[in-house]
Amino acid sequence: MVARRTLLGWGLAALSLQGCGWTPMYADLATGPADADMRAVRVAPIPERIGQKLAIALRDSLNPSGEATPQRYILRISLQVVRLDLGVSTSGIGTRGRLEVYANFNLADIVANTVLLSLTSHANESFDILANQYSNTVTEDDAHTRAVEELRRDIMARVTVFFQRRAAAAAGRP
């Protein structure tokens, strides 16, 4: 009886969201109004290894099927990476590190040569500093990987919202 009421409650909640115009941001890019625009974004090369990882992750997210699409937009990103020692032992050696990555990005129309969106994203990851050099390399690389994923999610969300709002405005919806 309780399970039936719970199921009925969730069903009514889902139907009420449909009536208010709410749409899931990542439901299905293939049917979304911003799909063609998302696939038409070219990610400019980003220097350093962390930049290469971010560029590849963004390319895979913007065009998951890898279809050849005429490029109408370019996404330029500049990264600033800061590594800090947080915890310091009595001998003066760091025991905990923090990696801060700032991504200044802008989305530009290639044909009109105009900037459509210019924002900053920030990722903050921490890692252990160990006595073994190999372990340090692995933990710091893992922090870079986590930072790239955090930046990718944030940049994708912002670009997706931009294109969805633009498509809604073109269709005359609020």
Regions found by a protein language model. Give the residues of each.
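Post-signal-peptide N-terminal segment of Sec-exported extracytoplasmic proteins
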Residues: 39-72
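C-terminal/domain-edge helix-coil "capping" segments
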Residues: 138-174
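Bacterial Sec signal peptide processing site at the extreme N-terminus
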Residues: 18-36
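Surface-exposed short loop/turn segments
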Residues: 65-72, 76-120, 125-142, 146
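Bacterial N-terminal signal peptides
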Residues: 10-18
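N-terminal export leaders
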Residues: 4-8
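Short beta-strands and strand-coil junctions in structured, solvent-facing domains, enriched
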Residues: 64-65, 84-86, 158, 162-165
